[in-house]
């Protein structure tokens, strides 16, 4: 295999209805192979932070600064010299820290988390903490800004159950409560979204029992409880799940590859939280590719649009694609997708910079 350059591009919404998008210049944030990239916005420092596994498999973080339609990056900082898979990052706005959850392959594949502190264009890390002393996969992470807690959802490989745990950041460390099972079936592609209107955590996932499914969680202290799971795509697997909260319409939006009949650029669906349950509108197709994978979402609050990126397949070629959606009631309208990278694009993530009013798209190519 050759070296893969990981690049970040700034996506600028034009505000058209239905919304389309324009793409700024591309900047490398790593000069080596990278995988499992995940990104977030640090609003206290007005920085984008990307977490990923570098060419050695080392867990790495890098800080980006948006200026106009470009993004520049500081020097990458290693947070783990073990192979670090399933990296997922979130910003803790109560403590002004980022938290990265990952599978530590050098420590029996345990689920592990670490706290990062941004300073200027660099980032420093505390000591890693194990949150699941068992083989851990398919990690998603979110932040509950009402309870001021981090929530990590993951597949515990020993049981294959979908499991969640609440984390409390203190300084440069994090401690955890007791894990809670939200799905007693094989749970994959766990995506965590916080609904700030209802102060609920929504975990979306695909499982053998009910395929595309979501569970609503309520954080109390250092624990979380879940309502009854609701299927949003009950007949087929919903892979490469991602989620975002539209704070204008107060809706959760999910984006996924509709397997095994993914003859389109994936599907998106609008969810409405009520109490400890969630209901869904009708799923809408995204793009026109013959398959989709590596989906990513962000909400652009400056124009109230959902940005959605994915890897699409067209006549033997993989392309990086981008579309924009507008939520209305329980439905979403999606504009025609554009190409942001005319080459194979994977490990895609999106983060909205509310200072610059731009969504930063990170990907491998």
Regions flagged by a language model, labelled:
Residues 1-18:
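Intrinsic low-complexity, repeat-rich intrinsically disordered segments enriched
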Residues 13-365:
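Extracellular, repeat-based ectodomains that mediate carbohydrate processing or recognition
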């Amino acid at each position: 295999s050759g070296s893969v350059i990981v690049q970040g591009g700034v996506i600028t919404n034009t505000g058209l209805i239905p919304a389309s998008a324009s793409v700024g210049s591309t900047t490398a944030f790593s000069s080596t192979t990278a995988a499992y990239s995940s990104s977030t916005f640090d609003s206290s420092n007005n920085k984008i932070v990307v977490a990923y596994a570098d060419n050695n498999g080392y867990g790495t973080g890098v800080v980006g600064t948006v200026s106009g339609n470009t993004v520049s990056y500081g020097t990458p900082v290693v947070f783990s010299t073990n192979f670090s898979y399933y990296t997922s990052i979130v910003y803790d706005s109560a403590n002004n820290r980022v938290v990265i959850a990952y599978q530590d392959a050098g420590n029996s594949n345990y689920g592990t988390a670490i706290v990062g502190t941004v300073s200027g264009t660099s980032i420093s890390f505390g000591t890693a903490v194990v949150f699941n002393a068992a083989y851990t996969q398919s990690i998603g992470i979110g932040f509950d800004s009402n309870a001021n807690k981090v929530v990590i959802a993951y597949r515990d490989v020993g049981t294959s159950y979908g499991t969640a745990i609440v984390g409390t950041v203190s300084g440069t460390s994090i401690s955890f409560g007791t894990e809670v099972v939200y799905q007693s079936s094989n749970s994959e592609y766990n995506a965590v979204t916080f609904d700030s209107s209802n102060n609920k955590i929504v975990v979306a996932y695909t499982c053998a029992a009910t395929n595309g499914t979501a569970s609503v969680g309520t954080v109390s202290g250092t624990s979380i409880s879940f309502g009854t799971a609701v299927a949003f795509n009950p007949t087929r697997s919903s892979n490469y799940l991602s989620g975002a909260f539209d704070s204008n319409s107060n809706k959760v939006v999910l984006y996924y590859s509709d397997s095994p009949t993914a003859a389109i650029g994936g599907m998106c669906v609008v969810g409405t939280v009520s109490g400890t349950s969630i209901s869904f509108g009708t799923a809408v197709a995204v793009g026109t590719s013959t398959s989709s994978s590596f989906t990513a979402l962000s909400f652009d609050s400056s124009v109230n649009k959902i940005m959605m990126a994915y890897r699409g397949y067209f006549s033997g070629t993989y392309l990086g694609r981008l579309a924009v959606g507008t939520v209305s009631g329980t439905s979403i309208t999606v504009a025609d997708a554009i190409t942001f990278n005319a080459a194979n694009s994977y490990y895609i993530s999106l983060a909205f910079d509310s200072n610059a009013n731009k969504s930063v798209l990170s990907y491998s190519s």
